[in-house]
């Protein structure tokens, strides 16, 4: 009897792993991404990526496939030293004037000054939902994990496994939510000296070029976008591989909420929901809702 139970358990585990395998990929960059610009300013080799920026050009890639719900993650090491004027970006996006987008952007700074972790979300073409943080670690002396988790209930931004931001789904109350467009994954390194560092006051020092940002071990556990049919398929809880539809992912745990609040209390430097001057007192409607 014990032998039969063991065999049954092994079968169940094997089936679960097979199901997970259809949605989980540690990507070979050269096979799973294409260069969108700066082909001679980048290097892809297996699970390693190098993006290069000099005065002539930057570089960017995008995934060959799009996803609707799940999680994507990448280990990233940012430009060291004086990175003023540079922006490294890692984000999900669809296309068109009513596109959806979920952003991580890393705004460089002068030597000795901290980076800015810039997050934003667009739904049906509408953005202006920025939240910014100072890193509580050195993002240039090693690789750190940046994860975007996206399900029918909420979008969560994670840094090294700790949530830093949540955007919840209030579509039933007329607030747009990114749930009807497949999004591809993008990574880029580019010059944004007109605004990126201290409002554009500090420019890029091109004598320090080339600037290099690195990525490693990109992984996607996400629903493959197959067109409009995916809008229903990717939220179907009866499909075993749709793990993100589990009620356990509809809201952060108490422990996660505690960790996130510590980061937000200690390291958040901008929240659009508190910028009454910018919106002239007419705040975005989601700002009055439960945030987490």
From Swiss-Prot:
GO CC, any one term: apoplast
Keywords tagged on the record: Apoplast, Cell wall, Cell wall biogenesis/degradation, Disulfide bond, Glycoprotein, Glycosidase, Hydrolase, Secreted, Signal, Transferase
Cysteine-cysteine disulfides: 223-234, 273-287
Compartments where located: Secreted, Cell wall; Secreted, Extracellular space, Apoplast
Class in the EC hierarchy, top level: transferase
Active site (UniProt): 101, 105
Reactions catalysed: breaks a beta-(1->4) bond in the backbone of a xyloglucan and transfers the xyloglucanyl segment on to O-4 of the non-reducing terminal glucose residue of an acceptor, which can be a xyloglucan or an oligosaccharide of xyloglucan
Assigned EC number: 2.4.1.207
Annotated site residue numbers, Important for catalytic activity: 103
Post-translational modification: Contains at least one intrachain disulfide bond essential for its enzymatic activity.
Organism: Arabidopsis thaliana (Mouse-ear cress)
Pfam families: Glyco_hydro_16 (PF00722), XET_C (PF06955)
GO biological process, one term: cell wall organization
Task of the protein: Catalyzes xyloglucan endohydrolysis (XEH) and/or endotransglycosylation (XET). Cleaves and religates xyloglucan polymers, an essential constituent of the primary cell wall, and thereby participates in cell wall construction of growing tissues.
Binding residues for xyloglucan: 105, 118-120, 128-130, 194-195, 199, 278
Residues of the signal peptide: 1-27
Protein name: Probable xyloglucan endotransglucosylase/hydrolase protein 26
Domain GH16: 28-215
């Amino acid at each position: 009897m014990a032998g039969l139970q063991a065999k049954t358990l092994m079968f169940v585990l094997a089936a679960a792993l097979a199901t997970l395998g259809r949605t989980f990929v540690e990507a070979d960059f050269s096979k799973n991404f294409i260069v969108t610009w700066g082909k001679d300013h980048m290097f892809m080799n297996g699970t390693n990526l190098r993006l290069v920026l000099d005065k002539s050009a930057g570089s960017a890639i995008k995934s060959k496939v799009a996803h609707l719900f799940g999680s994507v993650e990448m280990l990233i090491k940012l430009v060291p030293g004086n990175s003023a004027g540079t922006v490294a970006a890692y984000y999900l996006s669809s296309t068109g004037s009513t596109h959806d987008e979920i952003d991580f952007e890393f705004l460089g700074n002068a030597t000795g000054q901290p980076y800015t972790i810039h997050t934003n979300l667009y739904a049906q073409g509408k953005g202006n939902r920025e939240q910014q943080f100072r890193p509580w670690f050195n993002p240039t002396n090693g690789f750190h994990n940046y994860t975007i988790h996206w399900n029918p209930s909420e979008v969560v931004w994670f840094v090294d496994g700790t949530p830093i931001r949540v955007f919840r789904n209030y579509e039933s109350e007329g607030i747009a939510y990114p749930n009807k467009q497949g999004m591809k994954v993008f990574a880029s390194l580019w010059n944004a000296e007109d605004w990126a560092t201290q409002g554009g006051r500090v420019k890029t020092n091109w004598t320090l070029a080339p600037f290099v940002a690195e990525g490693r071990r990109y992984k996607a556990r996400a629903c493959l976008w197959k067109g409009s049919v995916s809008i229903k398929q990717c939220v179907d809880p009866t499909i075993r591989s749709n793990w993100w539809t589990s009620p356990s992912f509809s809201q952060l745990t108490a422990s996660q909420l505690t960790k996130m609040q510590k980061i937000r209390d200690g390291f958040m430097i901008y929240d659009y929901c508190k910028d009454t001057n910018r919106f002239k007192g007419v705040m975005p409607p989601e700002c009055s809702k439960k945030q987490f």
